[in-house]
Amino acid sequence: MDQSDIFYRQHAQATFVLVHGSWVDPFFWHGITRELLKMGHIVHTPQLPGHGTDKDKNVNHEIITKQVVHYITSNKLNNIILIGHSFGGTVIQKVAEQLHDRIKRLVFWNAFVLNDGESLTDQFPLQAQKFLLDLAAQSSDNTIKLPFQYFRDVFVNLADLQTARQIYSATTPEPATPLVEKLDLKTFYQLSTPRSFINLQEDTVVPTGENSGWYPHMASRLGVYRFIQGSGDHMSTAKVYPRRMAQLIVNASRD
C-alpha cells in the first residue's frame, strides 16, 4: 500500500454526482469513476439531454437542469458532492437552486460560473463567440461541431495526436441553445452551500485575461471557496491521468 492509498482511506465514503460538459457524455468520467470506486466512494454520472446517445438536439438549459434534478431525486440521493466540468458548471448552479438541501458541496472543475443574467457564450471574447455562433448557424440543427484542429490545439493541448483523435472521435455536436441562453441565477447567489474550484493550469479553453478565464475571473464569483490547482488540459487529462484527477476531486470534496 503506497502513501496515496493511505491518503484515500483516510476519507469517509462520499456520494459523487458527476455532471459532464459539452460535446461529451458520461463516458468522459469513465476512468475517474473507476478510481473513485476503488477508493470506496459512490459515483453517479447522469447523461445530459441532447448528448451522447440522445439524438434529439432540440433542448434548452431548463430541460437539461430538470433531467439532473430528476436523476438525483428519483435515485433518492442526499448529502452529495455535485461536480460540474466545463458547461456542467452552469448546470450545477441551476440544480443547486432547487436541491441545495441535498448537496454537501459543489465542485466546479474548470467549469463555467455565470453571473446572474449571463450566458455561457458571454464568457468568451467576441471573436470566440462569433466563431462558435457561426458554427451553429452553418449546421442544419443549431448544433456546434468543433473542427478537429481547433479541438486539438485548445481542448486537448497536452495530448499526443493519437489520443487527441481518440477523444475527438467520441465527441458529438453540441446543442447551441443552452450555451446562448441567459440564466436567472439570483437564487444561486443567495445560497451558502460550500463550494470548491479545481483549476488545471494548462486548460486554455477560455482565454485568461482581465475579464475572462477560469481562475481567478470565474472562480472568484463563488465568493468563499476552496481552491485546488493541478496540471492538465480541458479534456485529455481525465482520460490519460484519471487517478490524478480523482485525487484532486477528493481534495476538493473532503470535509
Segments (PLM) and residue ranges:
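Conserved HGGG/HGGXW glycine-rich cap/lid loop of the alpha/beta-hydrolase fold
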Residues: 11-53
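Active-site loop/oxyanion-hole signature of alpha/beta-hydrolase fold enzymes
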Residues: 42, 48-81, 97-98, 121-124
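Gly/Ala-rich beta-loop-alpha elbow adjacent to hydrolase catalytic centers
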Residues: 83-88, 92
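Flexible "cap/lid" loop of the alpha/beta hydrolase fold
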Residues: 97, 103, 107-139, 178-179, ...
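Active-site nucleophile elbow and catalytic-triad environment of alpha/beta-hydrolase enzymes
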Residues: 169-188
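Short beta-strand/loop motif that positions the catalytic acidic residue
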Residues: 191, 197-199
